[in-house]
Amino acid sequence: MSPALAAGLQIAAVVIVLAAAYVPLGDYMARVYASPSDDDPSDDAGSESNGTGGGTALRTRTRPRTDSRVESLIYRLCRVDPRAEQTWIGYSLSVLGFSAASVLFLYVLQRVQGVLPLNGGLSGVSPSVAFNTAISFVANTNWQSYVPETTMSNLTQPMGLAVQNFVSAAVGLSVAAAVIRGFVRVRVGGELGNFWVDLIRGTLRILLPLSFVIALILLTQGVIQSFSAGFASTGLDGSSVTNALAPVASQEAIKELGTNGGGILAANSAHPFENPTPLSNVVEITAILLIPVALTRTFGTMVGDRRQGLTLLAVMGALFAALLAVTAAAEAGARGVAAEAAGAMMEGKEVRFGIPGSTLFAVATTGTSTGAVNSAHDSMSPLGGGAVLLNMLVGEIAPGGVGTGLYGLLVLAIVAVFVGGLLVGRTPEYLGKKIGRRQITLAALSVLVMPALVLIGTSVSVLLPSTTGYQGNSGDPGTPGSIHGFTEVLYAFASAANNNGSAFGGLTVTSDWFQTSLGLAMLLGRFLPIVLVLALAGSLVATKRTPPNPGTLPTHGPLFASLLLGTVVLVAALTFFPALALGPIAEAVQ
């Protein structure tokens, strides 16, 4: 089979599954996050006045399901009133409090794993690694500065890391639901919902069932599921090798579905125990994209105009397709001694996946906040590596992480509406809500968080003499080694600030500086935007909805999609072009 045909078949399989799941999954998630207060007749009138096709019919389709017995039991045990609503401040404090408790629990669990069951002879994790890992998994980044097989026990993996894979993804879904309510509701008190209800519903009704199905599919492909310590085998050179075993299938499913990315094995999805066949590779890519893509349908359903969701999906799809084309062309057309000897750019890639399966996975994992890898990104061609780096630098909105991609793109949509309003001399509006000074200020601050963390972290790191020894590639300024070394540092901070978790392997990040600085980048990159977008939703929910008029900029269709796409590209280009010119672009033209 030719590489072109293999690439086409894999892309077609992913697109077909995503298209089949788009409507049922998107509408199902809208029902999960629908609130009884959204059925208020005053809201229906508001939706109709906005001309979005909302009203009673829509509310009937999204009418919330009653709480299950399990959910009701959890509410009673945790003393949560599911009927209570929170303002953006209360919602933010709940998110931050829950995440802080999660960091503390995961840190302590790692430190004491040596005295707990199923430790496999492993001792407690060192303080710096435990700190970095706790923040990483709670922030949905899953950055791994350790070797999982020799660091984390078979109790820490499922009890600590896998649990965070579920709840960190559920936090992202909850925030996205709260932001959507900011557009849907009109509340003088500014209520956005109940974080604890959203968290529990997202975990029990969406993530757990889907993960169970995906885990079963992966088991049929040979992904392992075991609590044994491991087994010994003889390598090709005659030496004895210890092969680690772990409950991989159950964690692999939520690793991809929740756009987490942290592998239970060091080689991540390149390891045959995690991703053994081309079919399992397609399943994992589909799982990565499934919820972020369907959330655009959820958004359109909840706001009462599904064209809005399709417009966002078109922007996501255009960015994804463009970056996939660039990456695939760069990898397929790469030249050099190694590439010519192997017949293709196969360094760092698994033969069973080839270039098509590796590039599709790389673009999917960097276009979301997943960060899982089935190939070595550091071994990609300069343009290929630059493309996946750019995929993160545009904000991971193609299609973005679970929840984070949607609200990240909505923030950029508000910026695009504001720019469009300036062009025509009209007060900017989005879905009937006027975008004033407070709204655009919060949106701008949210957009600026990630670039500030990436550029400041990178510049300080490359200036510190103590970090030079941790760069696998270095040399005099302007030499190929120094250029690629700079790209490795830039990639690390882009990955951390965007809560991605993938890395260029040539950079050693076990020093106290990188453990701490990248940990802070993950922490601030996750929770500062969450607080800002919740504040934005709080200001929108208290804003009256205005009916459209002849001067209103339509926020659906090709015109607005082009405006939004241009805004995304312009913001990324103005912010990161100098850094990219010093890194992958300079490396490519040498």
Where are these regions (language model features)?
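Membrane-proximal intracellular helices of multi-pass ion channels
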Residues: 1-590
